[in-house]
């Protein structure tokens, strides 16, 4: 009989540490869109796997790009 239960989950690694990205630019829309849900919300750390340091920088960059109208506040 097969074991039932939770499937094995891999530990998520920080995207920015793996790709050696030091600075998150608010003008890099393609990068920022990876961390925004389809509803326009910023995805939490537990979903994306980013470290606390880069999550804070990512949040600031997303909010800046919204302020300058590069990203929408909500989904269309």
UniProtKB/Swiss-Prot annotation:
Record's keyword terms, sorted: Ribonucleoprotein, Ribosomal protein, RNA-binding, rRNA-binding
GO cellular-component term (any): cytosolic small ribosomal subunit
InterPro entries (alphabetical): Ribosomal_bS18, Ribosomal_bS18_CS, Ribosomal_bS18_sf
GO biological process: translation
Pfam assignment, any one: Ribosomal_S18
GO MF annotation, one: structural constituent of ribosome
Gene3D superfamilies (UniProt xref): Ribosomal protein S18
Function summary: Binds as a heterodimer with protein bS6 to the central domain of the 16S rRNA, where it helps stabilize the platform of the 30S subunit.
Family under the similarity heading: Belongs to the bacterial ribosomal protein bS18 family.
Oligomer status and interactors: Part of the 30S ribosomal subunit. Forms a tight heterodimer with protein bS6.
Protein name: Small ribosomal subunit protein bS18
Originating organism: Brevibacillus brevis (strain 47 / JCM 6285 / NBRC 100599)
